[in-house]
């Protein structure tokens, strides 16, 4: 079992190499249909399984097409990783779509909407009625 430091170093190396492959060596047109970037790599402690999280910018159709292209290129990516990274065993590669950027944008837009509603809402009266008034007795 590899140490935590080694796992994180190998994960960063895989992230860098897969990013380079996406830019230069994967020739599948489906992969180029959406703007794509590798956001993270989750590597198992025994260095046998790598989940590669990718963020795809584009329409839903482009995302689906890009994910299909990545899934078909999984064998090629694993083979290239074996040539570029010298490990005893090359990890199994699984591509996962990372939608955290979109979810973050949705949360920010909701927060801006709430802030805008609060600014446009008239301020409620925070003054308490005098002690001897009729409203205070109710």
From Swiss-Prot:
Subcellular location: Cytoplasm
Gene3D superfamilies in UniProt: 3.30.300.20
Record-level GO cellular component terms: cytosol
Residues of the signal peptide: none
Keyword set, alphabetical order: Cytoplasm, Ribosome biogenesis
Entries under InterPro entries matching the protein: KH_dom-like_a/b, RbfA, RbfA_dom_sf, Ribosome-bd_factorA_CS
MF term (GO), any: ribosomal small subunit binding
Keyword hit for Cytoplasm: yes
GO BP of this protein: maturation of SSU-rRNA
Region (Disordered): 117-138
Main localization (coarse): cytoplasm
Keyword Cytoplasm belongs to the record: yes
Biological role: One of several proteins that assist in the late maturation steps of the functional core of the 30S ribosomal subunit. Associates with free 30S ribosomal subunits (but not with 30S subunits that are part of 70S ribosomes or polysomes). Required for efficient processing of 16S rRNA. May interact with the 5'-terminal helix region of 16S rRNA.
Family label: Belongs to the RbfA family.
Assembly information from the UniProt record: Monomer. Binds 30S ribosomal subunits, but not 50S ribosomal subunits or 70S ribosomes.
Protein name: Ribosome-binding factor A
Source organism: Acaryochloris marina (strain MBIC 11017)
Record lineage: Bacteria, Bacillati, Cyanobacteriota, Cyanophyceae, Acaryochloridales
